[in-house]
């Protein structure tokens, strides 16, 4: 995403500092209108994209036009499933990490939690306790579990989603209010 190019650049730097061939990996920061020329280049054999449905449709069309392999991971709604034989403590720990990884601002962060009835009450009780104990703060402070969202508009959008969900019948188990500060 355009607001987090540093991750790709850091991956490229690390790979270039290693023993791997220097041309093995490239981070290319371009606008959507530049992607067709890149995908159509004879040296490009395939393309991957993790992103929105609209970005995937554009990249998929361009890859098909150039007859290139494409792998698209779009608009994920990643499920986290807890079955009756699960170790609840492990499930709670893993679930918390899966939801909060990179502040939840990654397409692979768990978003749907499916829990069988037989362990639901215990799982819900423990996961609520875990999230209540999660400390938001400065990401450089080791005592913080999560930092702020990447952009203010994302914070507003997330709060609107919560309000819409409540209006449609959802209940809030933890939080639900926008924290003070930036």
Regions from the PLM with identified roles:
Residues 1, 29, 50, 83-84:
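Short beta->alpha connector loops at strand-helix junctions that form conserved
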Residues 1-23, 67, 89:
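Conserved small-residue-rich beta-alpha loop and adjacent elements
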Residues 16-19, 38, 61, 104:
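A general structural signal for stabilizing positions within well-ordered secondary structure
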Residues 24, 46, 52-182:
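ALDH superfamily catalytic-core signature
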